[in-house]
Each structure stands twice: as structure tokens, then as C-alpha cells.
Amino acid sequence: MGNNVVVLGTQWGDEGKGKIVDLLTERAKYVVRYQGGHNAGHTLVINGEKTVLHLIPSGILRENVTSIIGNGVVLSPAALMKEMKELEDRGIPVRERLLLSEACPLILDYHVALDNAREKARGAKAIGTTGRGIGPAYEDKVARRGLRVGDLFDKETFAEKLKEVMEYHNFQLVNYYKAEAVDYQKVLDDTMAVADILTSMVVDVSDLLDQARQRGDFVMFEGAQGTLLDIDHGTYPYVTSSNTTAGGVATGSGLGPRYVDYVLGILKAYSTRVGAGPFPTELFDETGEFLCKQGNEFGATTGRRRRTGWLDTVAVRRAVQLNSLSGFCLTKLDVLDGLKEVKLCVAYRMPDGREVTTTPLAADDWKGVEPIYETMPGWSESTFGVKDRSGLPQAALNYIKRIEELTGVPIDIISTGPDRTETMILRDPFDA
């Protein structure tokens, strides 16, 4: 039995994690975010009603579930307040269900200004960040100058620390980026206005999780973005600023690494990517357009069109290695309905002619990589909303089986639509 279950993306994000976390939290006592910030976009559809969460864990819609934002998350007070209000306006008692780590770094206005100034300065070499201040906030954390949720308990000291760090960042903005300075008093006033709300939700997350473990409570750890965007193991520098892999669970929540019982990798039936960076299986033809249209591939956070392509099992195998995956949840299988043939990338051909079955390590080594495909028959029957494996077309079952063979990981859950009911649970992670 797995009490501590991790749900994370195995590709470049946008795999459909939010729905699966929401579904599995029916049995969970706690849901924990452990990295990222409000650059995530987790879409839930329940009885036809759509909810998009960026910062608050997907368990917030469940009664009797406590949602926790762990220390690995960079927290924007403005974004949190906005999201809380939207949920509270719908009658969801967020403050009764949400807890925060005092060690969460704060994202403030100057982080956003820096993020946008840097992307503008990069020009054609822009990384394609969400422009929400995530990277600069993590930089401040590592440089040990960042302000944290716990700093809000002492408002006088907070004001002094804020003044010092803003002098540093405003100097950069004005003198290097030729941008406008951020107003200190406004940042201070805005933050102080919500300080008591934030501090009222603070708990010792590591201790809480250890007590939950000792009681045998079910805990779900909700990843954001995807494995291939990991700051250390992703397609650097076209990555996010946090550890999106399973290792981030321990460091970003305070749970001891030995206590992770099951790691569920969310795997989209094809590949997508937002922003710049390597993408060997990207399609620029009518099939790519088909996947974008059928899959509604537009970012929940930015609204940007996602790049689309065939499923890359070479990249996915890297995710298997990095996360020690226990099983997959295959999502958006229904998007492939109607295609005469489907392709799986099984290897890469390097510029020198070599065939490799592992991903390059350095970003420059991805240049000129060509995908080697295995082509399989498609299916004309609809898989949308199918809730039993026996109801899937044989060609779809063959596709699923081949993914399992190529990755060495079983597909334990199959999603055939956006609603939480449109799902087949072949093996429940909490029972594995």
C-alpha cells in the first residue's frame, strides 16, 4: 500500500496532472505542492464546470482534504489572494483547507519586472518564461537575500529587508535594463495588507507530513510543469527554475525521501511544449495542427499555443530513470481518434549518423537530432469518455501496450476526457 503518492509530469508540462490529482484525492487526506509557482496551470473539469488553478493545490475542491503549499514553491501573495477570492466567491472555504510553509519564498513586483526586462533584453534568444517572476524569486532564494512567508511575522524587520533587496534590484532594472524602478512603498503596502492572512495559514509542514505518515494517512504530492523542464535534468537552459522531478518532493516539502511509496508519471499520448527549446518530434504539418485543435493545446496560464508532435519515448525513458516511476497515467488518448496512423519516436539519429536511445545531456547536442519513428495503425472509433479498457479499439490497446514495452513501465490509469469520471483506474496508486 502506498501512503505517499507523487503525481508529476513526464514531458514538458501540460500533461493533465490537475485532473488526475483531483481524481485520486478522493482518498487523500493531504495534497501538497512542492515546487514551481503560479506559472503552473492545472485545469479541472467536474460535472462540466471548469476550474483553473495556478498556485493552490488541486485538492482544494475536496471537502475533508487539506491542501499544502510547501517550501519549494515560490509564492506570489497577489496571485494567491486572487485565486483564493475566485474560489471563495464560489463558496469554497479556502482558508479552512489551505496551509503554507513559512519557508516559501515570496514573489513580489520587482521579480516580475526583472523577469520581463530580461526576456525583452534576450530578444530572439528569449527562453519563453511566463513572465511571472518565478526565476528571479528562485535566484533570490539561492542568493540568500529572498524574503519568505515567515518574514511576515515581524513586519518592521520585513520592511527593512524589503528596502535593502529592492535597492539592489532597482539598481539593475534602471542601470542595466533601462527599465523603470519598482515603487518600494507600494510593494510594502500591498504585502502588509495581506500579511496576516498569509501568516494565519502557516504550519510546520515537515512535522505535519511526518505525523501523517505515522498515522498512515494518504498524502498526494502534486508536481507542476514536467520532468524535461527540470532545472538540473531538463533541456537546459530552456527549463523552469525548480526541480520538477521526484527528487523535488523531499526538498520541496520536508518529507523524508525514503517515505515516497509510489511515483505516478502523467504521460500525454502525444507530445507538446510551450516556449523555446529542443523538441525532436515537433510537427509542422496538418497532423500537428490536428493535434493542437483536437487537444485544445493552448496554455492554461499564458494562453500561448503549444507546439505539438508525436510521443517521444526516448525522452520519456529519461523521465522513467530520473523519477523511478512506478506507473503511468496516459492522458488525452482520445485526441488521437481518427488518425490513420500514429507514430512513436523510438530512437534519435544524431548529426554524425549514430543512432541513440537516450536523450542528449547538453542543449547544443540536441541540434540536428532527427527522430526515428515506429509507425502503427490508428483507429477511427471514438475513445472519448470510454470508462472500461474492453471498450477501447484494438489499435488503441496496441498503442498502449507498445508504450509499456518501450518504457518498461505499466500504464495504471487511462484518461479519455477532461472530466474526472472519464478515467479508467487499472491500478490505484494508493493500493499499489
From Swiss-Prot:
Catalytic activities: IMP + L-aspartate + GTP = N(6)-(1,2-dicarboxyethyl)-AMP + GDP + phosphate + 2 H(+)
A GO CC term assigned to this protein in UniProt: cytoplasm
Consequence of changing G13V: Significant reduction in activity
Enzyme Commission number(s) of this protein: 6.3.4.4
CDD domains, per the entry: AdSS
Pathway field: Purine metabolism; AMP biosynthesis via de novo pathway; AMP from IMP: step 1/2
Primary enzyme class: ligase
Assembly, per entry: Homodimer.
UniProt similarity note: Belongs to the adenylosuccinate synthetase family.
Protein's job: Plays an important role in the de novo pathway of purine nucleotide biosynthesis. Catalyzes the first committed step in the biosynthesis of AMP from IMP.
Protein name: Adenylosuccinate synthetase
Species of the source: Escherichia coli (strain K12)
